[in-house]
Amino acid sequence: MDFSLPSEFAKSALYYCPQFGQFICNSDYRIERNGIDQYLLIYINSGSLCIRTDGMTAEAHEGEIALFDCRKPHCYWCPDKVDFYWFHFNGAGSKQYTEYLTERFGLVHEKQPMLSLKDQFRTVVHSAQYGMSTQFASMNEHQISIAVHSIL
């Protein structure tokens, strides 16, 4: 898991990702929280991940994404082995967009075209990692915001 500190501009005008990474987990993996002030997007590379929040329960499988509001109590776990990219995000329009998409489609989405979706997740994770230690951090904030918007 990695962390990044968004600029004041990113906090006010862009989507930004303060935490991100790739996890490979077994059935011991379980996260249960009362809430944190962020939203979460997950892309399943292989395996499956179960999610429970806001009166809904769903299971995301390989090639699918999960989206939910982490400000509400939530729990997610893997029934077996799972490999996934993930990032917490926030910023302009995050609340409204997350509410709209989860009300319309639920917690798990099968996006089309799926081929580029995994690349967008990689862009977020790698741009955030690269931006943490270089003079290109502000440029990467824009790339991250564009990639998050493309995924949504």
Predicted features along the sequence, with ranges:
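Generic protein-terminus/edge-of-domain signal
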Residues: 1-61, 72, 78, 95, ...
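A short hydrophobic beta-strand segment most commonly corresponding to one strand
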Residues: 40-43, 65-68, 80-97
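Solvent-exposed, well-ordered amphipathic alpha-helical segments
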Residues: 48-52, 59-63, 83-85, 113-118, ...
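Short C-terminal domain-edge/linker segments immediately following a structured domain
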Residues: 49-54, 72-74, 82, 97-99, ...
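Amphipathic alpha-helical segments enriched in hydrophobic/aromatic residues interleaved with Lys/Arg
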Residues: 99-152
